[in-house]
Structures are given as structure tokens and as C-alpha cells.
């Protein structure tokens, strides 16, 4: 058995390859490309790899999977707690990972499937859009609150200016030219983001239709489609608990 520790960065990784006795077979920096990785591991048989969980570490996990290499995803903080080092270098970090894998001390985290990660990205993008839209709404409310008494009185005719009735009132406001441009820009931005939210809502609905677990969760009072899909995606496999 061969053990490969990967200290992963956005553009490159430092890889240390240990044999079953713990001797270093090879160590070096490799660009995060399949061809370079294949060249580095040429001749290796019965390989197990380990990489710390990170924002882009799954790109390496997928490449290794395509090469037929099973990869363990390690918990970064727990790795640090187990194997403290006074001097940190890429080489030492990759060796540390390979050594912990060989000795059976890797603190492992749940490794998500490609499909699950894609579903996560859908949900996170929707959350991103909703957050941006909330910022735009707050900015528009603040801008309207800074207008004269007559404008504020018109706006106060509705509880929510983001309803159809509220938007009609905004269009009819007798704002100074510069203020009207500011309000108009925010309204257009609000509608643009709403279109993006609607698009991602459709993707969430597709996920819901494909997920029996999400449909089951949605039967619980208080769970809508988005929350049901979110819980199902985060759990992924109930058997891991």
C-alpha cells in the first residue's frame, strides 16, 4: 500500500508519497492538473490519498477519483491538534497527512458526492441572491426615508413598497431628478435579483422532485420546499450518523 498526503492550494499542491514502511518515495510540488498528477504518481499501485477539507479541495478529490484513487478528506483543525508543528511548510504538511493516513490517525470528515456538492451550490447561490436582495431593499427603504414629508407620506400608504401596489406608488413619486435616478436604479436591481432568485427556485424545485428524503421532510409542519431540500442535502446519507 502507498500513502499520498496532499497539501492543496488553489494553483498547485505539494504531494508526499510514502510506501507501506513510511519511507518517502517522492515529494514535490505539482500543478493542479490531471496530467501532472498522473506523472507524479506514475508507477504507484494500491494508493490511498488524503487531503484536508477546504474550499477547492474537492477538485483534487474528483481528479483522484477519476484516476481510481480513494481519497480521505481530513478535518483541518483536528489534524493540527494531532500533529502540531513549530515550523509549517507545504512539504511538512503533506508528509504529516501521509503519515497520519498510514498510521490510521486521520480525523476524517464526511466526503460528499459530486451530485450532493452540486446541490449545495444551488442552495448557496439562492441564499447569496436573497442576501443581496435584502441589502438592496434596505438601501431603498433608507433612501426613501431621507426624502421630504410628501414623498414619505406617499410611501407610507403601503406597508411594503415591494408589492405590486408599492411599486406603482414608487413609479408615481414626484422625486427630484437625481433622487429619481437613485430610486430607479435600486428598483431595477431589485427586479433583476428577483429574476435570478426565480431561476434558482426552479432548480431547487427540480432537486425536490428528485429527492424522496426532501419530500418526506417537507411533510413536517413548518418545512417548505427550500428548507426540506436544504436539510436533505446537508444530511445526504442518514446512515452516517
Feature map (PLM): residue ranges:
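Short glycine-rich, Thr/Ser-proximal phosphate-binding strand/loop in the N-terminal lobe
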Residues: 12-34
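Short alpha-helix plus adjacent loop in nuclease-associated cores
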Residues: 72-124, 158-166
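Short, basic/hydrophobic alpha-helical segments
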Residues: 32-48
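Short glycine-rich phosphate-binding loop at a beta-alpha junction
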Residues: 47-56
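Catalytic palm subdomain of template-directed nucleic-acid polymerases
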Residues: 229-239
Amino acid at each position: 500500500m502507498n500513502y499520498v498526503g496532499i497539501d492543496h492550494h488553489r494553483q498547485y499542491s505539494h504531494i508526499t508519497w510514502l510506501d507501506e514502511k513510511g519511507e518517502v518515495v517522492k515529494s514535490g510540488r505539482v500543478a493542479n492538473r490531471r496530467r501532472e498528477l498522473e506523472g507524479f504518481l506514475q508507477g504507484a499501485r494500491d494508493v490511498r490519498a488524503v487531503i484536508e477539507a477546504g474550499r477547492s479541495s474537492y477538485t483534487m478529490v474528483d481528479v483522484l477519483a477519476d484516476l481510481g484513487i480513494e481519497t480521505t478528506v481530513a478535518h483541518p483543525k483536528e489534524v493540527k491538534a494531532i500533529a502540531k508543528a513549530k515550523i509549517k511548510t507545504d512539504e511538512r504538511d503533506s508528509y504529516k497527512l501521509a503519515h497520519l493516513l498510514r498510521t490510521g490517525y486521520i480525523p476524517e470528515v464526511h466526503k460528499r458526492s459530486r451530485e450532493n456538492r452540486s446541490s449545495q451550490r444551488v442552495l448557496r447561490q439562492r441564499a447569496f441572491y436573497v442576501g443581496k436582495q435584502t441589502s438592496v431593499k434596505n438601501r431603498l427603504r433608507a433612501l426613501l426615508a431621507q426624502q421630504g414629508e410628501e414623498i414619505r407620506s406617499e410611501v407610507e400608504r403601503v406597508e411594503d413598497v415591494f408589492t405590486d401596489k408599492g411599486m406603482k406608488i414608487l413609479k408615481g413619486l414626484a422625486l427630484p431628478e437625481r433622487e429619481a435616478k437613485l430610486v430607479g436604479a435600486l428598483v431595477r436591481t431589485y427586479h433583476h435579483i428577483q429574476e435570478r432568485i426565480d431561476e434558482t427556485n426552479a432548480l431547487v424545485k427540480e432537486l425536490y422532485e428528485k429527492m424522496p428524503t426532501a419530500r418526506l421532510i417537507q411533510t413536517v409542519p413548518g418545512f417548505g420546499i427550500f428548507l426540506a431540500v436544504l436539510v436533505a442535502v446537508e444530511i445526504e446519507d442518514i446512515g452516517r450518523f
